[in-house]
Design a protein with these regions (language model features):
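Expand to "…catalyze enediolate/carbanion chemistry for C-C bond making/breaking, isomerization
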Residues: 1-284
Length: 284
């Protein structure tokens, strides 16, 4: 059975993390990015967790543009995090350190499950198919640690550039691909992982271009300077838009496949053309 993905929950591709212990930057983050992730996991220490929860509860932000990242299910503060979210207008909840089960405390919320444990990778199908899960997001660094590794990316002594992060290792790329495929099969959206070196704008751009053209709904950002880079990556090039317009126009005159500039165009390419135009329209 075909099910449409709930992509309308992601209003734009540039999704910026904001630490929950810094309420002064909440409005700035929402003004810059398409969506903001108010972060209780890495954005607040244990000593200030109550204050951070209150910061989120008191924030007057557009609920359609807010994701709250709670602590993982094994954290002592998980239940209090979820209870706080239920007291707010916010319903999109990002849950880190998922293993195989979605905790019952999340019932009725829109859950973005993080795939960053070996157990979650093995159990992606069940996680993606859970009725409360609307999307998946992955994290390379925690997964690398839990796999017993030391680096999620190739290093200069392995042939990577000296002046920028290398590409992800095969285990990371496999996780990303499996997550994306299982999410699509279950009718859910995906968000691509952060590019940790926010000075590496070219690397961020290249990874975001791949995410956009592969079908991810958005890419996570950890610094405001990454936002426009992501938007630019998700915005189709003029030549792509021109091609898509021609394909869609020509498809009106043919019941099936047709030839355009020496290339055979059939239903999958027509669908891709429509998506290019949708991306271009969404990019404004």
């Amino acid at each position: 059975m075909h099910r449409s993905r709930p992509d309308d929950l992601i209003v734009g591709p540039a999704i910026l993390f904001a630490p929950a212990n810094r309420p002064d930057i909440f409005p700035k983050a929402t003004a810059i990015a398409d969506m903001v992730i108010l972060d209780l996991e890495d954005g607040a220490g244990d000593a200030e967790r109550d204050v951070a929860r209150n910061n989120i509860a008191q924030a007057s932000l557009d609920p359609s543009r807010v994701i709250v990242r709670v602590c993982g299910p094994d954290d002592p503060g998980f239940k209090e995090d979820v209870e706080m979210v239920r007291s707010t207008p916010y319903s999109l909840v990002m849950v880190p350190k998922v293993y195989t089960d979605i905790p019952k405390e999340l019932e009725g919320l829109h859950v973005i499950a993080m795939i960053e444990t070996p157990q979650a990778v093995v159990g992606i199908q069940g996680i993606a198919e859970h009725p409360d899960v609307v999307g998946l997001f992955w994290g390379a660094e925690d997964l690398t640690v839990l796999l017993g590794g030391t680096h999620s990316r190739f290093m200069p002594d392995e042939g990577a550039p000296d002046n920028r992060p290398g590409p992800y290792r095969d285990t990371m790329r496999l996780t990303r691909a499996l997550m994306h495929i299982h999410a699509a099969a279950a009718g859910k959206f995906t968000i691509d992982a952060v590019h940790a070196d926010f000075h590496d704008q070219q690397g961020m751009f290249e990874e975001a271009v791949d995410a956009a053209r592969s079908g991810f709904a958005g890419s996570a950002c950890i610094h405001p300077k990454q936002v426009e880079t992501v938007r630019r990556a998700y915005r189709p090039e003029p030549a792509q838009v021109e091609w898509a317009l021609r394909v869609v126009d020509e498809s009106q005159h043919y019941p099936g496949a047709f030839k355009l500039d020496g290339e055979m165009v059939d239903a999958p390419l027509i669908a891709q053309a429509h998506r290019v135009l949708a991306r271009a329209h969404g990019a404004g």
